[in-house]
């Protein structure tokens, strides 16, 4: 009888230790992601400040127009957008790594918290003229709630795809010269 009680006590202590380690891991992961998110938002503000120093007038942006047609400093603005996209990509990679770690043991609250951090970061991109991304991601998440690692990674991929389109529009690789993509009709 004493051995049975001893085994029960050992099992309870082992389970408590396992839960404590799991909670500690979640708290460390959450703190690391929040810190990374805050660092990224600060980098985006720094990028904006540097672009302002190069002549970009962010105040000229309208609700829908955030390009060089509504403000000065076209190349500096495009470079700022690309820098912000590159930095955001690094953050999204961290999110992916953490989601994969929690894939089997994570709960819906953890994935939703990671999604909220991604939304905060996406919203901060509006400071450099990358707008509308948050609304598109939120719209998609209404149909597919972010409660699993797979759905979180799908939302991350959606953000990356949309940022890729914005980055390509900046046309930085070609010396910053924007070209008119409208083809002329032959008569």
Swiss-Prot record:
Gene3D superfamilies: Decorin-binding protein. Keywords: Plasmid, Signal. Coiled coil: none annotated. It holds the Pfam family Decorin_bind. It comes from the Bacteria. InterPro entries: Decorin-bd, Decorin-Binding, Decorin-db_sf. Residues 1-20 form the signal peptide. Binds to decorin which may mediate the adherence of B.burgdorferi to collagen fibers in skin and other tissues. Belongs to the decorin-binding protein family. This is Decorin-binding protein B.
């Amino acid at each position: 009888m004493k051995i049975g009680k001893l085994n029960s006590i050992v099992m309870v202590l082992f389970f408590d230790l396992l839960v404590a380690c799991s909670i500690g891991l979640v708290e460390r992961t959450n703190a690391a992601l929040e810190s990374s998110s805050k660092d990224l938002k600060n980098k985006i503000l720094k990028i904006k400040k540097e672009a302002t120093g190069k002549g970009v007038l962010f105040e000229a942006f309208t609700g829908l127009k955030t390009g060089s047609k509504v403000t000065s400093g076209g190349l500096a603005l495009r470079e700022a957008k690309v820098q912000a996209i590159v930095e955001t990509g690094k953050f999204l990679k961290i999110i992916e790594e953490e989601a994969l770690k929690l894939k089997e043991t994570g709960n819906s609250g953890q994935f939703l918290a990671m999604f909220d951090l991604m939304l905060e970061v996406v919203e901060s991109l509006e400071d450099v003229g990358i707008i509308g991304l948050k609304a598109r991601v939120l719209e998609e998440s209404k149909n597919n709630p972010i409660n699993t690692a797979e759905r979180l990674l799908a939302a991350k991929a959606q953000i990356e795809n949309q940022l890729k389109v914005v980055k390509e529009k900046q046309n930085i690789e070609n010396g910053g010269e924007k070209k008119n993509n409208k083809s002329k009709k032959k008569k």
